[in-house]
A protein has these predicted regions:
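Long, internal low-complexity/basic segments
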Residues: 12, 75-76, 83, 91-149
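Intrinsically disordered, low-complexity polar regions and short flexible loop motifs
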Residues: 86
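Short beta-strand micro-motifs enriched in acidic
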Residues: 69-73
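Polar, surface-exposed loop/tail segments
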Residues: 1-61, 120-125
């Protein structure tokens, strides 16, 4: 069958634990959700009302059908998409849907503030082309995000 709700790669670990009938350790915070109740018993709702991503320079949130991405490298930039109307993220609404942008920024700020600080500093900050395979040559004007490692 097909499960059409949004999930996150962090759900895999929790789902494996659930399939093995192993309780999640209380001493470790696990962000993922066990997907088995949603898949096997048709549990109502969805595993995540909101999804977050964060690294040192790039952060994103999906809430309801809106996605906000923001990056600080090489320059500060924001992207806002209505995923219901624009699933391929072609129309950046960041300068139009200001109330939604403000709400998602506040939610993302709160989430980022709740995260533990990195244990080790990043060693590399490399440019990655947006919507272009790494096998294609970089052209002046190509859109980039910077990915830390």
């Amino acid at each position: 069958s097909i499960y059409d709700k949004r999930i996150h790669h962090t759900d895999i670990f929790s789902t494996i634990l659930g399939a093995a009938n192993i309780e999640e350790p209380e001493s470790i915070k696990i962000d993922g959700e066990n997907l088995l109740p949603f898949i096997l018993t048709n549990k109502k709702g969805q595993p995540h009302e909101t999804l977050y991503w964060k690294n040192s320079t790039y952060q994103a949130i999906i809430h309801n059908d809106w996605k906000l991405m923001r990056s600080e490298e090489p320059v500060k930039q924001e992207f806002l998409y209505d995923l219901k109307k624009d699933p391929y993220e072609q129309n950046n609404l960041v300068s139009i849907a200001l109330d939604t942008k403000d709400l998602l920024n506040k939610m993302l700020d709160k989430h980022v503030e709740s995260m533990p600080k990195p244990t080790w500093p990043q060693s590399v900050l490399m440019p990655v082309p947006v919507d272009k395979p790494n096998t294609e040559e970089f052209n002046e004007g190509d859109e980039l995000i910077y990915w830390p490692n």
